């Protein structure tokens, strides 16, 4: 459903790059546009409760921190170049493919105006195609993505000693 506000004031796009850091495709750059208002960076911690009989509550015990998660809606528009948007969308989803040498998807870097996150692409869901060319090829589309921060054990140990 389209919000009337979005019709009057179209969402501001952000332009970013996804850089492949590891594997056979290291050095590859995938340019993307995203809906700025959907850019969300979150961090979570895990806590457990400690059973203490006779109390009106439960004491919490910190268990571990979780990696940061970056979510957003990517926007694809092929109207200016007469491009079927399924091609650039598949370039993004291909970043989830397992690298045969590493036996895992590649580590990436999401980069946008001074912000950089070393990550993996955890989830990519094609939400919709918004319009099409006369021959039926989709000309605009959106995809919801989630990146999970990727740090090595050594990086996490060094980081925990600094705090």
Regions found by a protein language model. Name each.
Residues 1-163:
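Acidic, Ser/Thr- and Gly-enriched intrinsically disordered low-complexity segments
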């Amino acid at each position: 459903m389209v919000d009337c506000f979005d019709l009057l004031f179209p969402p501001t796009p952000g332009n970013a790059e996804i850089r492949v850091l590891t594997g056979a495709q290291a050095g590859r750059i995938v340019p993307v546009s995203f809906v700025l208002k959907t850019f969300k960076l979150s961090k979570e911690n895990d806590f457990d409760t400690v059973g203490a009989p006779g109390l009106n509550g439960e004491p919490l015990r910190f268990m571990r921190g979780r990696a940061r998660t970056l979510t957003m809606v990517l926007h694809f528009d092929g109207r200016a170049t007469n491009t079927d948007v399924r091609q650039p969308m598949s370039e993004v989803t291909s970043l989830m493919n397992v690298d045969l040498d590493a036996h895992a998807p590649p580590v990436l870097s999401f980069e946008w105006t001074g912000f950089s996150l070393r990550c993996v692409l955890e989830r990519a869901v094609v939400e919709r195609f918004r319009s099409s060319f006369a021959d039926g090829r989709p000309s605009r589309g959106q995809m919801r993505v989630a990146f999970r921060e990727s740090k090595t054990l050594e990086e996490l140990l060094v980081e925990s000693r600094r705090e």
